[in-house]
């Protein structure tokens, strides 16, 4: 978010918009308020409430039941899925949940540049980075995987290799878990719009009821 202040009273709406962007998990980013020197010299009687302390809560968006059930059915139908952990996993503090999810169903996990450090490199199901800046292990596994589960990733060209990495299997499907509706619908993905942590927990509970396991044997080792 960027705004240039031309009148002192404009600061009130500009600050509200800045905090709106900073606390929006889908559209979050930097906020810049440009305050020219001449405006700084002007006076304005701001109301007292404008200076009172306010704590902004970042809400966790829960995915719609229909989308959660759709995600569950996609994963159940997959024999060799792969999870891609993006920057949204770090923002959601969902690293532990991702590891629990992968261990429960024997799903390999790769990390994007933005998502790196959300999981320890020593995690037994981690196959390292993916895409043009990734490693051999994750990119090779993509050849045979039938479902990509993107969690908190924007699926940019560094991750997809301009689609040349993720789409070597012509029958591959994509499930995108993201707080942003735009990023959740990239690559013709089946969307599941919600916070990474709570959405994975909801999907995991249903998959455990179904006793789901992947068909991987020693490929991940």
Language model regions located:
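Conformationally flexible catalytic loops at phosphate/diphosphate-handling active centers
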Residues: 21-77, 210, 217, 221
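Phosphate/diphosphate-binding loops
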Residues: 17, 130-186, 190
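Short beta-strand elements at the ligand-binding edges of bilobed clamshell
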Residues: 3, 56-62, 121-134, 185-200
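Anionic-ligand anchoring segments at beta-strand to alpha-helix junctions in alpha/beta enzyme folds, i.e.
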Residues: 63-64, 70-148
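Conserved thiamine diphosphate
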Residues: 1-25, 144-145, 184, 189, ...
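Phosphate/pyrophosphate-binding active-site segments
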Residues: 9, 32-34, 46-47, 171-221
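Glycine-rich beta-alpha junction loops
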Residues: 35-41, 87-89, 116, 155, ...
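Short beta-strand segments
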Residues: 6, 32-36, 84, 150-152, ...
